Amino acid sequence: MAQKTLLIITDGIGYRKDSDHNAFFHAKKPTYDLMFKTLPYSLIDTHGLSVGLPEGQMGNSEVGHMCIGAGRVLYQDLVKISLSLQNDDLKNNPAFLNTIHKSPVVHLMGLMSDGGVHSHIEHFIALALECEKSHKKVCLHLITDGRDVAPKSALTYLKQMQNICNENIQIATISGRFYAMDRDKRFERIELAYHSLMGLNHTPLSPSEYIQSQYDKNITDEFITPACFKNYYGMQDDESFIFINFRNDRAREIVSALGQKEFSGFKRQAFKKLHIATMTPYDNTFPYPVLFPKESVQNTLAEVVSQHNLTQSHIAETEKYAHVTFFINGGVETPFKNENRVLIPSPKVTTYDLKPEMSAKEVTLAVLEQMKLGTDLIIVNFANGDMVGHTGNFEASVKAVEAVDACLGEILSLAKKLDYAMLLTSDHGNCEHMKDENQNPLTNHTAGSVYCFVLGDGVRSIKNGALNNIASSVLKLMGLKAPATMDEPLF
C-alpha cells in the first residue's frame, strides 16, 4: 500500500441519526450515496476529550485541524491542567515546587470561577491545598468574574474558597476582573488592583459582606472595586507569587506590574525580589518559571511527508486557509520543504447563505490540477457546511452540501483514474442540526461524530475512531511509517 493520497476535510458536515432539520440528510448528494454503497466508512469523534477539550464541549476548526495534523490528542490548557491536578502531579512539578519553597508565604492570584475561559476555580483550590501541604502560609487574591459566568455569582464561588480557608489559608484581597485583568494598557485599573495587593484599600467587612455591599451599589462581579481584608498587610520582599490563570492575555499587565523592572504604567513599591511563577507562558519576555509549558507539536503529518522528500499541496478558500496551513501543521507558519499552498479567495458576500456554493468549484479545480501534476499528498478543505451552517439558513445549507457533493464527485472520479487514495472526513459537524427543539435556528457546531470514508488499495473496512487517528491513516495509505508520537490508524 503506497499511493498518492487525498485528505479531504468537509468542514461542518457531521453525522446525525435524526433527519429533522438535517441539511446533510435532505440534500441531493449522489457522490455521498455512491460512497456509502462502495467505500468503507466509519464514525469519527470530533469533540470533548477526544480532541483535548472539556467533556461535552463542541469541537472547532482550530482544534480539529491541529488534532488531524498532529495525529494525537493535544490537550487544551484547561483539560491538560485539570488532568495533571487530578493525577496529583503538582508534587512533582519543578516550577511549582521551586517557587513555593523560596518563601514561607505564597500568594495565589487568579480568576475565581468555573467559566473555564481564563481559569478554573478547581485549579485555584488545588494549588492552595498543595501549598498548605508544604506548610506554607497561603494568601488568596480573588478576582471576581461576572463575564464568563453569571454577573452576580461571586458569592457561590467565594463559598468554595472559604471552605478551604483555615489558619494557614486566608482570603487576602478581592478585585473585579475589570481592574485586575485589564489588557488594554489602562493602567489606572491595574493600579487599583496592585494597591490592594500591597495592603492598601482595606475594608473592615468580611469577603462576603464586601461583595454584598458592592451589589447594594449595583456593582456586579466584573466591576467589584479592589480591596484587601483584615490581617493582610501586603506583599513583602522575598515572598512567592503564582498567577493561576491559564489564558495569558489578561494576566500580563498585573504580572508585569509586580515583576518587570521596566514597567512604567504607574509608580510602584519597589521589590528587591518576588519569586513569581505563571500557570502557562504569558509573554516571551517574561523570565518567570511556568508550571505548564506550551507543548511543542512535532512530527506532524506535513512534517513527516516533507521528511520523506515527497510533495504536498494544502488547498482551501480564505475562510479555512489558516486551518489547512498553520493549524494542521501544528502551529507552524512557514511551509515545510516541498509544501505548496493554494489560497482561493472566498466570495465577497455579507453572509454565505447568499452564495452557499462559496468558492468550492475553484477549490476543486485547484485539487484536480494538483492531482494531474502528481502531487504526493493533497490536503483540501471545503468550508461550505460550516460557514453556511453558521448562518442558520436551512435551505442554503442544503445547497451548500449539494455543492460540496458535486465537487467530491469530480475529485473521486479523477482519483480512481489516477490511482489516488482518499481519506474524507470532517473536523466537526454543523449543518446536520439546524434548529433546536423550539424551532429556533442553530448556528453553532455540533458535539457529535462525523463520517470518515477511505478509498485505498486493500482497505476493506475501517474502525470508528477520532481525529487523532487520521494522520497515521493517511501515512499508511502513502506507504509511510507513522512516528511513535501518532496514534494508531483506522485500518
UniProtKB/Swiss-Prot annotation:
Its EC number is 5.4.2.12. Substrate binds at H118, R147, D148, R177, R183, R247, N248, D249, R250, K320. Mn(2+) 2 binds at D11, S61, D427, H428. Pathway: Carbohydrate degradation; glycolysis; pyruvate from D-glyceraldehyde 3-phosphate: step 3/5. Mn(2+) 1 binds at D386, H390, H445. It catalyses: (2R)-2-phosphoglycerate = (2R)-3-phosphoglycerate. Catalyzes the interconversion of 2-phosphoglycerate and 3-phosphoglycerate. This is 2,3-bisphosphoglycerate-independent phosphoglycerate mutase. The gene is gpmI.
